[in-house]
Amino acid sequence: MEVKPPPGRPQPDSGRRRRRRGEEGHDPKEPEQLRKLFIGGLSFETTDDSLREHFEKWGTLTDCVVMRDPQTKRSRGFGFVTYSCVEEVDAAMCARPHKVDGRVVEPKRAVSREDSVKPGAHLTVKKIFVGGIKEDTEEYNLRDYFEKYGKIETIEVMEDRQSGKKRGFAFVTFDDHDTVDKIVVQKYHTINGHNCEVKKALSKQEMQSAGSQRGRGGGSGNFMGRGGNFGGGGGNFGRGGNFGGRGGYGGGGGGSRGSYGGGDGGYNGFGGDGGNYGGGPGYSSRGGYGGGGPGYGNQGGGYGGGGGYDGYNEGGNFGGGNYGGGGNYNDFGNYSGQQQSNYGPMKGGSFGGRSSGSPYGGGYGSGGGSGGYGSRRF
């Protein structure tokens, strides 16, 4: 005879969730940013309710919103869902692809306002750059640390071709871009007892791609949606001093010598000419990521200037002139330079403009001004 549980008895899963969360419905140890997903490519018919109905299958949502034009109230083609814990975010990402209201959508880990200005912040890549690793750090140390995030395909600990000495950085490739997104959204990484800088590894083509997204539509700037995408109307990924445009990341003539891809500064002074990991020829040749010219940690102002990456957190900062000059990039996210929210003295303002005071501000494809995720103001 089947014994049914008494009415109202919590199921094991829901009980576990309650124990894991605080009184407010989420684990207080997990920042909201880590529990939030950006959902791109939404149908214009999708509402807050239909978005919630779909994504709450993988956990309890503490927030769900479809972003709309403040005047017309028309959907901008993207939204955000916030779960009660990171475990539920992982479950939703493992369930890809997602279809909402008959349309396949693109969920990604939400990028904070401060991180959205970094080159390639919204690009989909499967490789990370790991800087600041010491001589005693071996491949197995990197594998032991990063395999908890996802399946690793390759690990490359870069060495000097002639001496065989480690050059202080490595590349790790995963089988899923979401693993990379999850890693880079976490600010601090301690590997083999050393603080390390971890960011997306972008090729020259991917750096250029971050700037080339600007032309697909000129409206108010959806993320991969209709009417604007990553760029367009003056002040998004590409124009007016932002990703790839004049005075912006990877643009010609901006970025201050030594900032992300500006003019001949390369990738924050990793090298010259071009904006890949420091220069035309590639990782290890002249001007490259740690090459014989102004590379990573060599003389001439590479990653950390003359002192190399060892200057990290010890007053050396990144690139001799910091992130493009004019200030310090502290604690992986707070820029204390001369310009508002800029990584150095670049024209045209920071990506997304000034803070909108909104939890959704400062990200994907601002329409200029006080922009956030595709909007001037919320």
Curated annotation (Swiss-Prot):
Chain positions found as Omega-N-methylarginine: 52, 76, 214, 216, 226, 239, 246, 257, 354
Span list, region Disordered: 1-34, 204-225, 336-378
Extent of Pro residues compositional bias: 1-10
Residue numbers bearing the N-acetylmethionine modification: 1
Modified residues annotated as Phosphothreonine in this record: 124
Modified positions (Phosphoserine) in chain numbering: 14, 43, 112, 116, 350, 358, 366, 370, 375
Ranges where the RRM domain occurs: 35-118, 126-205
Phosphotyrosine: residues carrying this PTM: 360, 364, 373
Residues bearing the modification Dimethylated arginine: 52
Location of N6-acetyllysine modifications: 134
Keywords: Acetylation, Isopeptide bond, Methylation, mRNA processing, mRNA splicing, Nucleus, Phosphoprotein, Repeat, Ribonucleoprotein, RNA-binding, Spliceosome, Ubl conjugation
UniProt subcellular location: Nucleus
Regions of compositional bias (Gly residues) in chain numbering: 214-225, 346-378
A single MF term (Gene Ontology): RNA binding
SUPFAM superfamilies in the cross-refs: RNA-binding domain, RBD
Composition bias type Basic and acidic residues, residue spans: 21-34
Modified residues (Asymmetric dimethylarginine): 214, 216, 226, 239, 246, 286
PANTHER family in the cross-refs: HETEROGENEOUS NUCLEAR RIBONUCLEOPROTEIN A3, HOMOLOGOUS TO DROSOPHILA SQD (SQUID) PROTEIN
Function as written in the Swiss-Prot or TrEMBL entry: Plays a role in cytoplasmic trafficking of RNA. Binds to the cis-acting response element, A2RE. May be involved in pre-mRNA splicing.
Subunit structure: Identified in the spliceosome C complex.
Name of the protein this chain belongs to: Heterogeneous nuclear ribonucleoprotein A3
Organism: Homo sapiens
